[in-house]
């Protein structure tokens, strides 16, 4: 039988963790003064005033590296819980994780062959 009251703590946590950021933004929007001026519209980074055009377009190489990083970062997130519960899950979970890693390795080889990892 599906017991809904067992999920009360989950729903309370979800509502509270969703309400805290919303309340923080609302309170900061109400309490902070709004002053518009040229300083607010200029780019400012690391204490250095920009010289010339501050808007630069990033090369596509940065995005490719970021994409490959995200893929393998997500892989690590999925493999860690699997490794911690390997003895409980058994051989079928090992085969599934092996296929998952194999697919990601094939993707890495594909990116490598296409030159996505070359920095030139």
Curated annotation (Swiss-Prot):
Broad class of the protein's primary localization: plastid
Transmembrane segments: 9-29, 64-84, 88-108
Record gene name: ndhC
Coiled-coil regions listed: none
Chloroplast in keyword set: yes
GO molecular function, a single term: quinone binding
Subcellular location: Plastid, Chloroplast thylakoid membrane
Enzyme class: translocase
Membrane topology of the entry: Multi-pass membrane protein
Name of the protein this chain belongs to: NAD(P)H-quinone oxidoreductase subunit 3, chloroplastic
Highest rank taxon of the organism: Eukaryota
Sorted UniProt keywords: Chloroplast, Membrane, NAD, NADP, Plastid, Plastoquinone, Quinone, Thylakoid, Translocase, Transmembrane, Transmembrane helix, Transport
EC number: 7.1.1.-
Family: Belongs to the complex I subunit 3 family.
